Amino acid sequence: MCGIICFIQYGGQKIDLVSCLNCLDKLNNRGPDAQSYQVIELGDITIFLGFTRLAIMDTSEAGLQPFKDNNSNYSICNGEIYNYKNLAEKFNIEMQSQCDCEILLPLFNLRGFEGLLSDLDAEFATVIVDKYNSKLYAARDKYGVRPLYYGYNCEKGLIGFASELKALHSVMEYVEQVKPNQYVTIDLSFRPSIPFDLQNFVKLFQFTNYHEYYQSHKSLIDYHEPNIEQLQTSINHLLTEAVRKRLYADRQIGFLLSGGLDSSLIVAIATRLLGPTNIVCFSVGFEGSPDVAAAREVVKFLGIKNHHIVPFSVDIGLNAINDVIKTIETYDITTIRASTPQFIMAKYIQENTDIRVLLSGEGSDEIHGSYKYMRSAPNSQEFHKETIRLLEELYLFDNKRTDRTMAGNGLEVRVPFLDFNYVDFIMNIDPNLLMYKSDYIEKKIIRDAFKGYLPENILYRPKEAFSDAVSSKEINWYRSIQKITEEIYTDEKLQNSNYKFNKPEIKEALYYRDIFNSHYGGRDHIIPHYWLPRFQQNNVLDPSATILPI
C-alpha cells in the first residue's frame, strides 16, 4: 500500500504547505517507508502532490513518487500494475526503474486517460496532472480495491483527493468517495470565483463512467448450454493465473488464511506454484473457533510449516474497536465486526514479521453469490442482479475493511478473486450454475473445479461469516459486543438518538456510530446505507447470517 494526496488551490492564494503536510502525515500508516511531495505552479493555481510509500516493487529511491515526465506532467499512484512489463514491451516504453507505477505517465501520453484505464490490469488509485493541456485526472480500479476520496472547501477555493477520509476531514467541507467505475477530470484552465458555488463545482468536476457493470437483465436465453467440465477448467486456470500474477514483489509475501473456502483456495493454489516451504499463513480467532480448526487442517494437508495463529478474545476486540473505527472510517455494523479480528491480525503481522504483502480471499462471496441470504433469491435473474449490486458496492464494505485494516498497519493486500479476467468470466456464467440448490452447496461449481486441492471437508465446508467463524462454541464475538452495548445504552437512548441519516436501529449500531462521530463528525453520508441481507420477508436489522430464517 501507499498513500496519495492532492490539493488544488484556486484564486491565486498561497497554498498552506504546513496544512498539506499535516494531511499527508495522516497517510504515513499506508506508506511507512518514505514520504515525498511536489508543489506545481500553474498560473494562479497551485497543486500539491503528496506520497507516502510502502516499497514493494523496486525498493530503491528510483521508485519514489511523484513521477515526472519531459512534458512536466506528474503522476501519483497507490497500486499494483500487474501487466506493466507487457505494456512497456507493447508500446516500446523505456522504464527508468522497476517500479510498476512508472508506466502510467508514458502510457497516458500515448493512450490518453481513458486508453490508460482500459489497458491496466491493476488494483490502483491514481492522480495525473497534465500540465501541458491544463487537465487533472483521478480514478481508481473498477472494483474499488484501492481507495480514493475527493473533497472541496468552497470558502477557501480548495479541492482535494486522498487515499483516506482522515487526510481530508479537517480541511474539507464535503468529502465523498470516487466511485470505482468513474474517473474525474478537472479543467485547470477554468478559473472559478472564490468562494465556490454549486455552479463552479459543476464546471470544475467532470465525472465520466469508464466501466459499465455487468448486465442485470440476463435470462436463460442469453446462455448456451454449458459444458461443465470446460467451465471448471477455465475457472481453475483463471483463478490460478490471478494468484500467480499477485505473487511478484520485492518483499516477502504472506497469506491470510481464515479457514474458509476462499482463503484456503488461494493458499492451496499458491502452494502449488511456490511450494509449501515458501508459504507463510496467518489466522485469527478465539481458541476453539471453527475457523482456526479449519485453518490448521488446511496447512497440515498442504504441508505448510509456517503458520501463525493470532489469538483473539472479547477483551482484545473491545479494547481495539475505537482504533478500528478510526482506521476503517465507517460505522457499518458487519464491517466493524469483521474488521476487528482482521485489524488485530494485521497488527501482529506488522509487529512480529517482515512480511508486508498479503493475499486474501475477499470478493469471492459477492461475485459467486454465496452469502447465505442469496438462497432466498426468487429466480436466477434476481440472483444475478444481486451479485452485480454486491460487486458495485464492494468499495463501501469489504474492500474498505480489507484495505484499511492492512494499510492501517503498513501492509499491502492483494485480492485474486477480484482479478478482472476472473470476474468477467464468472459474471458471464449462467447464474443457475452458481445459485444454491437444495441438493448441493453454494459455489459448487467453484469447489468442483479444485478437487484435490484441499481436504474434502474443507473444500465442501459451508460458508460462515468471518466475524461468526472466529468465535468459539462457548463465546460469540458479535453477541459479546451486543451484551456490552445493552449495558451502555437504554432503549430510550437508542430511540432518541440524534442521528437522522442511517438511524441506528440496534444498540450495537449506536455504539459504533458514536465512536465514528467522535472521529469523523458530520461525515455520516460516507456510507449510503448499512450492509444488510436482501430477499427477507421481515425487516432485518442485524446483518449476521446466523439469525436468518433459512
UniProtKB/Swiss-Prot annotation:
<keyword id="KW-0028">Amino-acid biosynthesis</keyword>
<dbReference type="InterPro" id="IPR029055">
    <property type="entry name" value="Ntn_hydrolases_N"/>
</dbReference>
<keyword id="KW-0436">Ligase</keyword>
<keyword id="KW-0547">Nucleotide-binding</keyword>
<dbReference type="InterPro" id="IPR017932">
    <property type="entry name" value="GATase_2_dom"/>
</dbReference>
<feature type="active site" description="For GATase activity">
    <location>
        <position position="2"/>
    </location>
</feature>
<keyword id="KW-0061">Asparagine biosynthesis</keyword>
<feature type="site" description="Important for beta-aspartyl-AMP intermediate formation">
    <location>
        <position position="362"/>
    </location>
</feature>
<keyword id="KW-0067">ATP-binding</keyword>
<protein>
    <recommendedName>
        <fullName>Probable asparagine synthetase [glutamine-hydrolyzing]</fullName>
        <ecNumber>6.3.5.4</ecNumber>
    </recommendedName>
</protein>
<dbReference type="InterPro" id="IPR050795">
    <property type="entry name" value="Asn_Synthetase"/>
</dbReference>
<feature type="binding site">
    <location>
        <position position="100"/>
    </location>
    <ligand>
        <name>L-glutamine</name>
    </ligand>
</feature>
<feature type="binding site">
    <location>
        <position position="256"/>
    </location>
    <ligand>
        <name>ATP</name>
    </ligand>
</feature>
<feature type="binding site">
    <location>
        <begin position="53"/>
        <end position="57"/>
    </location>
    <ligand>
        <name>L-glutamine</name>
    </ligand>
</feature>
<dbReference type="GO" id="GO:0004066">
    <property type="term" value="F:asparagine synthase (glutamine-hydrolyzing) activity"/>
</dbReference>
<dbReference type="InterPro" id="IPR014729">
    <property type="entry name" value="Rossmann-like_a/b/a_fold"/>
</dbReference>
<dbReference type="InterPro" id="IPR001962">
    <property type="entry name" value="Asn_synthase"/>
</dbReference>
<dbReference type="Pfam" id="PF00733">
    <property type="entry name" value="Asn_synthase"/>
</dbReference>
<feature type="binding site">
    <location>
        <position position="284"/>
    </location>
    <ligand>
        <name>ATP</name>
    </ligand>
</feature>
<dbReference type="Pfam" id="PF13537">
    <property type="entry name" value="GATase_7"/>
</dbReference>
<dbReference type="GO" id="GO:0070981">
    <property type="term" value="P:L-asparagine biosynthetic process"/>
</dbReference>
<feature type="binding site">
    <location>
        <begin position="360"/>
        <end position="361"/>
    </location>
    <ligand>
        <name>ATP</name>
    </ligand>
</feature>
<keyword id="KW-0315">Glutamine amidotransferase</keyword>
<feature type="domain" description="Asparagine synthetase">
    <location>
        <begin position="213"/>
        <end position="530"/>
    </location>
</feature>
<dbReference type="InterPro" id="IPR033738">
    <property type="entry name" value="AsnB_N"/>
</dbReference>
<feature type="domain" description="Glutamine amidotransferase type-2">
    <location>
        <begin position="2"/>
        <end position="189"/>
    </location>
</feature>
<feature type="binding site">
    <location>
        <begin position="78"/>
        <end position="80"/>
    </location>
    <ligand>
        <name>L-glutamine</name>
    </ligand>
</feature>
<comment type="pathway">
    <text>Amino-acid biosynthesis; L-asparagine biosynthesis; L-asparagine from L-aspartate (L-Gln route): step 1/1.</text>
</comment>
<dbReference type="InterPro" id="IPR006426">
    <property type="entry name" value="Asn_synth_AEB"/>
</dbReference>
<dbReference type="GO" id="GO:0005524">
    <property type="term" value="F:ATP binding"/>
</dbReference>
